[in-house]
Regions:
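Classical eukaryotic N-terminal signal peptides for Sec-dependent ER targeting/secretion
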Residues: 1-9
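Disordered, acidic Ser/Thr/Pro-rich linker "stalks" and the adjacent N-terminal cap
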Residues: 3, 14-96, 109-114, 177-178
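Intrinsically disordered, low-complexity repeat segments enriched in small/polar residues
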Residues: 8, 55-56, 155, 160
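Trp- and acidic/polar-enriched beta-sheet ligand-binding modules for extracellular glycan
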Residues: 22-37, 44, 85-88, 110-178
Length: 178
């Protein structure tokens, strides 16, 4: 009887293990990984992240070293290395395709003590959702939210900073984080 129970348990364990690793489950995991952009930065310059409001935003002399989606190591000082938007304007980033993400990273200008009054929105097919609202944000931050399909991220400069009118971004990223 004990031997039969052992055999039954082993057969049951084998069937459960086989069912877990079925081709359907593996295919679903592969598709989900692709939809999540392989957990890479969807706003990366090389991934095709576009600043759609580039004509209305401000850059210092060299465009490439000032765009916040750049992949290279960057130097930031009072002359270059950042992008900013005026009061009541937005920095809008659009991707080549939609991705499922749950984390947005941004680095704000913080070489002088200042806090920013801004909002962050994500959208998919024109439906926008507020994911961050702050009257006193500073430095670099990760914004976590529920898994969602996203094709556009908008940083709205609601009130500028305590130092001036601008929302100054040094770096932006968006990705799926487990």
């Amino acid at each position: 009887m004990n031997f039969q129970n052992t055999i039954f348990f082993l057969v049951l364990l084998y069937n459960v293990q086989t069912a877990i690793e079925t081709p359907c489950t593996l295919r679903e995991q592969k598709i989900r990984k692709i939809l999540r952009g392989n957990s890479k930065n969807m706003l990366s310059f090389r991934s095709g992240g576009l600043l759609t409001t580039a004509r209305t935003n401000y850059y210092q002399p060299d465009f490439y070293s000032s765009i916040p989606t750049r992949d290279t190591i960057y130097i930031v000082n009072f002359s270059f290395g950042f992008t900013y938007s005026a009061l009541d304007q937005s920095l809008i980033f659009r991707t080549m395709q939609s991705y499922e993400i749950n984390t947005v990273f941004l680095s704000l200008w913080d070489y002088t003590y200042r806090t920013y009054n801004f909002q962050v929105f994500i959208s998919f097919n024109g439906t926008e959702k507020l994911i961050f609202d702050s009257l006193a944000a500073t430095g670099s931050m990760y914004i976590k939210f529920a898994d969602q399909q996203v094709d556009t991220i908008r940083y709205y400069n609601r009130g500028g900073s305590t130092d001036n009118f601008a929302l100054i971004l040094i770096k932006v990223e968006a990705f799926y984080k487990r």
